[in-house]
Every structure is written in C-alpha cells, then in structure tokens.
C-alpha cells in the first residue's frame, strides 16, 4: 500500500486565473477519499493532475513517499477507471484485462495468474471469453476495474465510473466498490458529482467548489457540521434549509424578514447586528403546536415519497422544507406548527459563508 500527498497544488490554464486554488491533501495508506462537487468545480482536473494527464502549475504530488510531480503517468504507480469503459471491442474480457500487462512485457504465466485472480474477485470467471458487446453495463464496468486491478497499482483513481449506469446498477456497483476496497485496501481517490456515492463510499469526503476544498472530513462530519454555507447546501437530500437574517441587537435572537425571530442563546452577543444565515435540515425540524410556542408554516405543496413526505412552505420570501413521517400528509394551505431544535441549528457568516 502507499499514501498520496498533494502539497499546495494549483492549476491555471492562462497563468492568471487559478482553477485549482492552493490545495493540500494527505491520503493515508489504504484510505478511500471521495472528491465531490458540482460540474466545473475542479475535481476531475485535480484527479488528472494526480494521474499526470495534466501538468501541475505549482506545488507537489507525492505517491508512496516519492515525488511524482513531473513523472510520466506510466511511472507513477497509478491505475485509472474512467466514466467510459474504453474496452477494446474486438478483444475478449480476458484479453482486455491482460493487455496492459502484455505490452509491459510481463510473462504469460504471470499475466494469467493476475487476470484469473482479478476475475475471481470481480465475479467475472464465467465471462472471460466474451466480447464487450455481450456484456451488460455493470459487467463492462467490472472489466474496466479488473483491467486496473491486475496492474496492482499503488493508487486507484476513479473518474465518475458509475455515471453511465442506471440507478439500480449504480446502487449495486457502489456495494461492489465497497467490498472491493475492503478486500484490496488500495489507496483510492474517487471523483463524483453524486453526493450519495460520496457519502456511501468515502472514508473521508473532500467537498469542492470553484477550485477550493471547502471541507475535508468524514461523511458524518460534513453532514453534521458543515464548514460553510456551500457545504450545507450541497450535502444532504433535500438540501439544508438556509434562512437569511440578522442577529438581534441583544445578540440572543435570530431575526428574519417579516418580524419572525428565533431564540439562539447568549453565545452570539459578539455578533449583534451582523447578517447571518441560519441552517437547519428538513429532517431535524419537529412538529409542535401553537401552545408550545411553535412557529407557523403554511404548506404550499406536499411531496409524497413513500417512506416519508416533504412539506414545502415559505417564511416571507424564504423557502422552508420539512421532512414528515409517512402518515403525516398535511393538505396544501394548512398550517404546520414547527419546533427548530437549537442544537440542530447552524449559523453561517452572511458575508464569507463560513460556519460561525
């Protein structure tokens, strides 16, 4: 196994604008890191820099304690699985998996041993003589992973490998990837725009936005304690409710437009008068009553999802979503009385967007 280190790495296409801001990341031996973010945030560019497919503008990349910043991709000890399977259509599964080893001059016996072992791990034993056109999408992706496994790389790089699969196959392949990593324990860097993939696969998640690592932490950490308004809005489905307001002059209330105010305790007196964003997840809002001091919300629409329901409403011009139990189905136009537990609220600076 081998570790991976990015040290103050940057990327600029024109020498002026940095598409990757100075970024440092330490990936431990055998760790599975997922980079997640919207399209254009820089995650695939960063992966290609690690692979050696894009030049680093400044900073250094280390794999297995060796500086590889200027090394050719073939010398870095990495294997890449792409979104597109890129299998040779005229070759069998076995030949596709063996090709990279063959052109490196490895002995036939050694190649056969590695291919058979990878096929066993990926349950491709009975498919080795088939051509890609005879395989399903999930089977083709397993062949692409097998081609990477036989190289026995120091680091696996995954560039949105499940994007071409349908929803059911993506669930199956996520489980297979988890199982594969538990068996191989190879250091892995995985790129996706899908937060479900990120949360289910990662030991740590790096949430990226506009070339910046907004937060690096475990899936639980980025869900329970988002470092910024962006992370709060990106991680979670549905997204966290984000309400813009101001800390009262007394510092103990969060005031929303329209006269609504929520108590926030005495810990924010130093922020009196400052614009803030209050966040709370739909699943953390509880039903209450007027007598218990609940806050009213008029239901605009109700989404019935099966296991639970989502009630949508507004406070002034700001939207609010509440997750309800399956049996709770308020009609449009009805009023819900809500309790927003203080320990489940998050405050973000109105200017910087950073957690307060």
From Swiss-Prot:
Molecular function as annotated in GO: ABC-type glycerol-3-phosphate transporter activity; ATP binding; ATP hydrolysis activity
Top-level lineage group: Bacteria
Main location: membrane
Enzyme class: translocase
EC number: 7.6.2.10
Membrane topology, from the record: Peripheral membrane protein
SMART domains: AAA
Binding site for ATP: 37-44
Family annotation (InterPro entries): AAA+_ATPase, ABC_transporter-like_ATP-bd, ABC_transporter-like_CS, ABC_transpr_MalK-like, ABC_transpr_MalK/UgpC-like, Mo/tungstate-bd_C_term_dom, NA-bd_OB-fold, OB_MalK-like
GO cellular component: ATP-binding cassette (ABC) transporter complex, substrate-binding subunit-containing
Residues in ABC transporter domain copies: 4-235
Pfam families on file: ABC_tran, OB_MalK
UniProt subcellular location: Cell inner membrane
Sorted UniProt keywords: ATP-binding, Cell inner membrane, Cell membrane, Membrane, Nucleotide-binding, Sugar transport, Translocase, Transport
Xref: Gene3D superfamilies: 2.40.50.100, Nucleic acid-binding proteins, P-loop containing nucleotide triphosphate hydrolases
Function text: Part of the ABC transporter complex UgpBAEC involved in sn-glycerol-3-phosphate (G3P) import. Responsible for energy coupling to the transport system.
Family: Belongs to the ABC transporter superfamily. sn-glycerol-3-phosphate importer (TC 3.A.1.1.3) family.
NCBIfam families: PRK11650.1
Known partners and oligomeric status: The complex is composed of two ATP-binding proteins (UgpC), two transmembrane proteins (UgpA and UgpE) and a solute-binding protein (UgpB).
Protein name in the entry: sn-glycerol-3-phosphate import ATP-binding protein UgpC
Species, as recorded: Salmonella paratyphi A (strain ATCC 9150 / SARB42)
Highest classification ranks of the organism: Bacteria, Pseudomonadati, Pseudomonadota, Gammaproteobacteria, Enterobacterales
Name of the gene this protein is made from: ugpC
